[in-house]
Design a protein with these regions (language model features):
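Terminal targeting signals and extreme-terminal segments of soluble enzymes
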Residues: 1-160
Length: 160
């Protein structure tokens, strides 16, 4: 885990993905059916092995009554931004789910896009630890930081 005052790792520190894995994760959330990531408008800007940069474009619908972006939208960005970072190391037979999510809010996000830089800090056999840093795209302000633990498992066929 990086210290609170340390900057997050740079994308260039992470290995480039094969073209097929990159294509799979670059389109995260842009599926035929509308799932939650697409509903809130999340977009992957960069994906590498163990790393993802994702944007939450500003929309008025994401604001709370005081005119700032709702903390739940920021928490969603934090949680979702690590999914491609985790998944970049696995094939489609592996599932993962959030076990723990801790968010620290530093500043309000006001009428600007949020950019999350997310990375895997440690991979175990059944658990992955991740971090995500959210900044305002135009202001450059640190908006929030997230620390997550994900469970890793083999997918089982769905039954009716």
């Amino acid at each position: 885990m990086t210290a609170m005052n340390e900057p997050w790792p740079c994308a260039s520190e992470f290995a480039i993905l094969s073209s097929d894995v990159h294509a799979r994760w670059k389109n995260f959330g842009n599926w035929d059916r509308t799932y939650f990531p697409k509903l809130v408008g999340l977009q992957v800007e960069d994906i590498r092995l163990g790393y993802c940069r994702m944007v939450l474009p500003f929309r008025e619908e994401l604001e709370q009554p005081m005119g700032i972006v709702h903390g739940g939208a920021i928490a969603t960005l934090i949680d979702a931004s690590v999914v491609p970072a985790i998944g970049s190391a696995y094939d489609n037979t592996i599932g993962y789910s959030t076990v723990d999510l801790h968010v620290q809010y530093h500043n309000a996000l006001i009428k600007e896009d949020a950019i999350a830089e997310a990375w895997v800090t440690k991979r175990g056999r059944s658990v992955v630890f991740c971090e995500s840093e959210v900044m305002g795209r135009t202001s450059g302000k640190r908006i929030a930081r997230g620390f997550m633990t994900y469970n890793i498992s083999t997918l089982r066929p769905m039954t009716k």
